[in-house]
Amino acid sequence: MTAAQFTNVTVNAQATISYDGRCSSHTIMFEDGRHKTLGVILPCDNLVEHYHFSTNTSERIEITSGECEVKINGEEEFSYYRAGQSFVVEGNSGFNLRTEQIVQYICHLEG
């Protein structure tokens, strides 16, 4: 279930920006030590067919708006996800993501 807002958190004001500004995220830290990132991904186009993201720890990516296709390392096909859905990527892995619209997400760092 998507949270509309988070309370009692510290936010890293410096964004993580990749793909020439097409992808950006901010880390939020909870009092109990948990971390999440909140991010925005802009649509792919003729310059960027898909984005590739690497993971250091297990992550659950929750799509909060938009829709996209995701192919986790080792999978043969892309899978479709839309707002309200999520997917899990193991640590020390990665995934490709392609989209034709703006996607917003919450990355739950689970490792």
From Swiss-Prot:
Catalyzes the phosphorolysis of diverse nucleosides, yielding D-ribose 1-phosphate and the respective free bases. Can use uridine, adenosine, guanosine, cytidine, thymidine, inosine and xanthosine as substrates. Also catalyzes the reverse reactions. Belongs to the nucleoside phosphorylase PpnP family. InterPro entries: Ppnp, RmlC-like_jellyroll, RmlC_Cupin_sf. Gene3D superfamilies: Jelly Rolls (2.60.120.10). It catalyses: a purine D-ribonucleoside + phosphate = a purine nucleobase + alpha-D-ribose 1-phosphate; adenosine + phosphate = alpha-D-ribose 1-phosphate + adenine; cytidine + phosphate = cytosine + alpha-D-ribose 1-phosphate; guanosine + phosphate = alpha-D-ribose 1-phosphate + guanine. This is Pyrimidine/purine nucleoside phosphorylase 1. HAMAP family: Nucleos_phosphorylase_PpnP. It comes from the Bacteria. One of its GO terms (molecular function) is guanosine phosphorylase activity. Keywords: Glycosyltransferase, Transferase. Pfam families: Ppnp. One of its GO terms (cellular component) is cytosol. The gene is ppnP1. Its EC number is 2.4.2.1, 2.4.2.2.
